[in-house]
């Protein structure tokens, strides 16, 4: 038996999806039975994710970064993310930082907590020290979803934060965004100041 996995949860029901409707429209009887059964399974998973996410307290900031490299070692990005996390929490911000936020969720699905944080956070920081880290599967999964949310909520802000690379090496989706160079002295203070302007925590 196949069990669907959800890594891009939405508030919209799968049965309302246009592609799903087309698939049902053109399916034969046996295919239709399979599609409807799988849609029902996805619907149940979605309801479970939404139930958990609705009980989560809202976040101010979501830190998006690559935790480990190809050899399983901790990345420079994770060290920078950790420093930023501690500075922001000292300033009174509620921050989603996977290494700490999800550490007591071992053995559980992370998606409900990521989904809740993406939807509530007013600011996302995308940390990267290599172009390929910005486009790593899980990193891109998070920031691409956040960009989509920004289209419907103009109060949300995404700040790309880069180091040891040029700004033009950032993903083209970030071309219209103001990026932060983490190689500059005092970059964390600059980030905190920028976030305070958005969230008004003075």
Predicted regions: what they are:
Residues 2, 130-131, 161-167:
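Short beta-alpha junction loops
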Residues 12-127, 147-157, 185-202:
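Conserved N-terminal substructure of TIR/SEFIR domains
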Residues 70, 104, 133-134, 167-168:
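Flexible, glycine-rich phosphate/dinucleotide-binding loops
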Residues 76-78, 133-140:
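Active-site-adjacent loop/helix micro-motif of nuclease/hydrolase catalytic cores
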Residues 141-145:
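Glycine-rich, phosphate-binding/catalytic loops in enzymes
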Residues 165-177:
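Glycine-rich, charge-decorated loop segments at or immediately adjacent to ligand/cofactor-binding or catalytic sites
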Residues 179-183:
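Short acidic-hydrophobic, aromatic-tinged amphipathic segments that line or gate anion-handling sites
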């Amino acid at each position: 038996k196949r069990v669907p996995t959800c890594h891009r949860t939405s508030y919209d029901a799968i049965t309302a999806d246009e592609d799903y409707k087309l698939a049902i429209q053109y399916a034969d009887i046996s295919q239709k039975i399979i599609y409807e059964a799988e849609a029902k399974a996805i619907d149940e998973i979605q309801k479970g994710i939404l139930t958990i996410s609705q009980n989560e307290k809202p976040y101010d900031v979501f830190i998006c970064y690559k935790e480990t490299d190809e050899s399983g070692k901790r990345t420079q990005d994770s060290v920078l993310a950790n420093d930023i996390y501690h500075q922001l929490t000292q300033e009174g911000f509620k921050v989603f930082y996977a290494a700490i936020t999800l550490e007591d969720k071992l053995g559980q699905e992370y998606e409900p907590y990521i989904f809740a944080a993406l939807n509530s956070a007013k600011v996302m920081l995308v940390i990267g020290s290599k172009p390929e880290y910005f486009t790593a599967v899980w990193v891109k999964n998070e920031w691409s979803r956040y960009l989509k949310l920004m289209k419907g909520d103009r109060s949300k802000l995404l700040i790309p934060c880069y180091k040891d690379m040029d700004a033009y090496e950032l993903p083209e989706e970030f071309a219209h965004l103001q990026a932060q160079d983490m190689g500059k002295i005092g970059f964390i203070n600059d980030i905190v100041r920028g976030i305070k302007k958005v969230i008004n925590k003075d």
